[in-house]
Amino acid sequence: MSFSRFDRYVDRHARSFAERLQTLCRMPSVAARGTGMRAMAEAVEQSMQRVGIGTRLFKMGTGYPIIYGECGSGPSYVVYGHYDVQPVGHLTDWSFGPFSGSIVDGKLYARGAANSKGDLLARLAAVEAYQKTFGKLPISLRFIVEGEDGLGSPSLFRFTDEHPDLFTAQGCIWDEGYRDTKERPVISLGFKGITFIELRAHGARSDLHSKWGAIVPNPAWRLVQALATITSPKGVITIDGFSSHLAPIDAQDAEALKAIELDEAGLKKEFRIGGWVRSMKGPALVKEHIFGPTCTICGMQTGHTEAGAKTVLPSTAMARLDFRLVPDLTPALVLNLLRTHLDLRGFKDIEIIELGSAPLAKASATSQVAQAVIGSAMEVYGTAPLVYPMDPSSGPVGAVCGVSAPPTPVASFGVSYAGSNPHGPDENVRLDDFLLSIKFLGRVINRLGEDNEETKTDKLRTSGRYAISKEEKIAR
C-alpha cells in the first residue's frame, strides 16, 4: 500500500498537530503536585474524541482519572500513554517557561513534550490521518491513558485488576523511544522493573543548634553511612545476596546485544561528562546499560539548604532511591534484601518507605507487533533501528501486559531524540521527529492489519466449507 496520501495529509496538517501538542503542553499536569490533573484528563479525552476514538473516563477515587478509548475493528492492540509529567525542578535551569510550549529552531520546549504528551499526540494524529486517507482502521486500538506514571501507577494496577478484559490483546504499543545521536530510531521490546523508595533517619525532636553536634546524634551522617554500604565506590551494588539473583543473559539476548552500539563520544558530549562508570566501553558498556541493575540516589534532603547561613543539627534526613530491576529481580525481593542488609549492619533504625514499584516486562523480537514496528522503522527512517531487548527505563508495562498468560508482547517507540532531556530542564522534541512518529505509527497500523488479513485468509483456506481442495490448489 502506498503511503503518499497519508504522508501528504500529515505534512499538510503539521502546523495543526504541533498546535495541539502545544495546547496540552501548556497545561501543567505534575502528578506529584496534583494541580490541573482533572482538566488535563478531560483535555486528553477531548483530543481522543476529536479523531474519532470512542472514550470512557474512569474516576479512580483519590487517584487521577484513567481514559480508555477504542477505535477500529479486528484484532486488538493496546496503546499505552500517560498525561502526567515530572516536576519542573529549578526554573532557573530552563531557557524557556516549562509550560510555555515555546517553539524555537524547530523544537518544542515544555515539560512533558518528550515524556509523554508528544508520544500521545503523535498516536492520535496517526489515527486521524489513517482514517482520513484510508478509512476505518484494520485493527482495533485500545488506548489506555493514565495520570500516575510518575507516582508508580497505583491506580493503573488496580484498574487492570478491575477491568482485565480491556487489556486482552495481541500486542501492546508503548510510549518510549527516541533517535540516538546518529539519528537511528531506538525500539525497545521490554523494560526494566523499578522500585522507588525513601530512606529516612531520625534524630532529635526538631533541628537543634549545631553546638550540640559533639553529643547529639546527627541523622544526616547516619543516613550517609547507611547509603555508603549499598554500593561500592565503583558503583557496584553491594547489598547482601543481590548479585546471586541476577539471571544470566540468554543466547537470544546476547545475540541482540551484538547489533547494538552506543555513540559513546556523542553521548559524552551531549551529557557533558568525561567518562563512563568503571571506565566501561564497547560491548561491556552496552550490556551494562541494558541488562545492568541500578541503584540511583535521586535526591537527598536534610537540614538547612536555603540561601544564607544557618548552623543547625538536622532532626531528620531523607534520601530517595530507585532500583532498576533486571531478570530475576522483583520489587519485593529487593526491598527484603535491602532491609536485611541494613539490619545486619546495625541500621535497623533507618526507615524504608516504598513509594512505587513495577515489575520488568520483556518480549520476543519475533512477535507480530515487534516485526511490524521494526519493519515500519526501516521504511520511515531509511535505516535499520537499534532494537533493545529491554529498555533501561521502566514503567507499568507488567501491569498492562501481564494481565493475560502468556504476557502480551510489547514494542515501544517514540518522538524523542538524544537531546530531548526528559525529566530534566529544557525538555523538548523536534517537530520533524514528531511528524515522523505519526507516519511511523500509520505504517505500523497497516502492517498489523495486513498480518490480520493474511491470518484470516489462511484460516479460510484451511477450514470448513471454505477449505481449498487439493485440485483447486493445483489449478492455482
Describe each model-derived feature in a short phrase.
Residues 108, 114-190:
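Acidic/histidine-rich catalytic neighborhood of metal-dependent amide-processing enzymes
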Residues 181-182, 238-316, 324-337, 345, ...:
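An extended, acidic, His-containing surface patch that forms the Zn2+-binding/catalytic region
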Residues 84, 230-234, 339-348:
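A common structural junction motif
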Residues 104-115, 383-387:
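Short pre-catalytic strand/loop immediately N-terminal to key active-site residues, enriched for Gly-Thr
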Residues 2-111, 132-139, 321:
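Acidic/His- and Gly-rich active-site-bordering loop/insert found
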Residues 212-235:
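A short core secondary-structure module
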Residues 186-202, 410-417:
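Flexible glycine/proline-rich, aromatic-decorated loop/lid segments
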Residues 83-85, 144-153, 175-179, 203-206, ...:
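Acidic, glycine-rich active-site loops and adjacent beta-strand->loop/helix elements
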